[in-house]
Amino acid sequence: MAVMAQTVQETATVLEEEARTVTLVAPKTTPRKYKYIYTNFLTFSYAHLAALYGLYLCFTSAKWETLLFSFVLFHMSNIGITAGAHRLWTHKTFKAKLPLEIVLMIFNSLAFQNTAITWAREHRLHHKYSDTDADPHNASRGFFYSHVGWLLVKKHPDVLKYGKTIDMSDVYNNPVLKFQKKYAVPLIGTVCFALPTLIPVYCWGESWNNAWHIALFRYIFNLNVTFLVNSAAHIWGNKPYDKSILPAQNLLVSFLASGEGFHNYHHVFPWDYRTAELGNNFLNLTTLFIDFCAWFGWAYDLKSVSEDIIKQRAKRTGDGSSGVIWGWDDKDMDRDIKSKANIFYAKKE
């Protein structure tokens, strides 16, 4: 634990001058005519209906081994998105040695949210032009569009236009991700669907019907958890670091998505590997995973933002909700507020 603490203390901090120059794009949208992708409608409809049936089977006939297996796979796929596609390959918040990259690529294939290369390109674009027409899942268009609707229609022309301006050279030249992209169909088909179905059947005698539909439930549930970061975490929650943007702090999303719901912080400081001011907590399992990998020697150059810069940014652009205190005499309590507080039946000195 001492080594882990030392690792966290040695993470890089961002210069104050850099933090002050960050300007976020204001949310906006313009009217558009949607061009629907009907094959996606059919695919998503079947997958969600089958997943609901899988949920029913979880409570009626599935073996406990299958449920435990699916629970473990869910967290593995979560890590493949949060630690792999998101914090490592999109935002470069830390560096990973080859064994960790391979593990995260396999976990990412288990999640099947396109290839990691495509995921990173769209997510970099999302941050660069957040909640505008150049954002693939523009939350200014509402909950449904930012949750799943954006996958059911053709991309906005601005997404295609500005997507070409995003530097993706590091991701395109990553040999692990090039391998995933080259063999995407057999790799993802095997890791995400075939093995999660075959293992329960042949290892503990689960029925084919249960194994397949519960595998789909695990996949669709994980998919919607990620979608909630794009939708719910851009609509509901407080904004302690920048009140001018849509991303907000959403504890429920953080719980489900292994720490990805501290979204107002993340959009202000996307280079922080913790994605939260208080990254080391039970809601942020991804940070704990990265810290463990750093202790193990597989992750290094973990980047974080200094406490002073966080406080300065919150004071300058936040909605005031960062000043949470435990009560009277908390060291963070505003002195002016304290001096002007009403005190009834005050004891006379």
UniProtKB/Swiss-Prot annotation:
Catalytic activity, reaction form? an 11,12-saturated fatty acyl-CoA + 2 Fe(II)-[cytochrome b5] + O2 + 2 H(+) = an (11Z)-Delta(11)-fatty acyl-CoA + 2 Fe(III)-[cytochrome b5] + 2 H2O
Concerning PROSITE patterns, the annotation shows:
FATTY_ACID_DESATUR_1 (PS00476)
Gene Ontology terms for molecular function:
acyl-CoA 11-(Z)-desaturase activity; iron ion binding; stearoyl-CoA 9-desaturase activity
Q: Which coenzyme or cofactor does it need?
A: Fe cation
The short sequence motif called Histidine box-2 sits at: 123-127
Q: How does it sit in the membrane?
A: Multi-pass membrane protein
Q: What is its EC number?
A: 1.14.19.5
> Where can the motif Histidine box-1 be found?
86-91
Naming one, the record's GO cellular component terms include: endoplasmic reticulum membrane
Q: Highest taxon of the source?
A: Eukaryota
Q: Report the locations given in the UniProt record.
A: Endoplasmic reticulum membrane
By its UniProt entry, which InterPro entries does this protein fall under? Acyl-CoA_DS, FA_desaturase_dom, FADS-1_CS
A Pfam family of the record is FA_desaturase
Annotated motif Histidine box-3, positions: 263-267
Enzyme class (EC, first level) = oxidoreductase
Q: In which tissues is it expressed?
A: Adult female pheromone gland. Increases by two or three orders of magnitude during the first 2 days after adult eclosion.
Q: Which keywords accompany this UniProt record? A: Endoplasmic reticulum, Fatty acid biosynthesis, Fatty acid metabolism, Iron, Lipid biosynthesis, Lipid metabolism, Membrane, Metal-binding, Oxidoreductase, Transmembrane, Transmembrane helix
A biological process term (GO) from this entry? unsaturated fatty acid biosynthetic process
List residues traversing the bilayer. Answer: 41-61, 66-86, 184-204, 282-302
What the protein does? Answer: Catalyzes the formation of Delta(11) fatty acyl precursors in the pheromone gland.
In the record, the note on similarity to other proteins reads: Belongs to the fatty acid desaturase type 1 family.
Q: Tell what the record comments on domains.
A: The histidine box domains may contain the active site and/or be involved in metal ion binding.
Kindly provide the name given to this protein in its UniProt entry: Acyl-CoA Delta(11) desaturase
Native source species: Trichoplusia ni
GN (gene name): D11DS
